[in-house]
Amino acid sequence: MPFLALELKCQLKGITDLRPDDTDSFHWHMKLKCTNCGEAPDHWQYVVLNEMLDVPGSRGEANLVEKCKLCGRVNTLTIVEDMFKSYNIEQNEKWQQIAVFDCRGLEPFDFDPRDEWIAKSVETGNAFHEIDLSEKEWVDFDDKAMEAVEISEMSSQFTTIRDPKKK
């Protein structure tokens, strides 16, 4: 079972603990490649933790079940619960794991952070909701700290990891 971790790297200024606002209903928008034939459609697909589909010919379920249009293979992707992490300012501008996916026959190769995110002020702990990262940057003002807060230079990558549930 290949597990792929979504890692982000960005520059935070004045905020920390950047994460999806609601991991249960967050839409993880990705571009996916079939690992059997290499078909990589240039369109975005999304998976949601609280949306499960039956896997044909199996007793299993997955967050995404897709039949490859080129080779016909049925592929699945499942979000690994309880593996969500926040992007933290202590490791600013370094790759940090945000989520983990169990990929069978699919390999994510691009991520679009277009759904709502949340973060908090480093100085005051003030929460910032509904952060829109569709442009991969965001700027606001922390009224309590009287300073600008921002997210910039966001990039993403997927890395193969061992089974995240095993110690």
Swiss-Prot record:
Q: Which family does it belong to?
A: Belongs to the UPF0587 family.
Please provide the record's keywords in A-Z order.
Metal-binding, Zinc
Q: Name one GO molecular function term.
A: zinc ion binding
Q: Which InterPro entries match?
A: CXXC_Zn-binding_euk
Where along this sequence does the record place binding of Zn(2+)? 34, 37, 68, 71
Q: Which organism is it from?
A: Caenorhabditis elegans
Q: Which SUPFAM superfamilies match?
A: MAL13P1.257-like
What is this protein called in UniProt? UPF0587 protein F46B6.12
Task: Give the domain section of the comments.
Answer: Requires a bound zinc ion for normal folding and solubility.
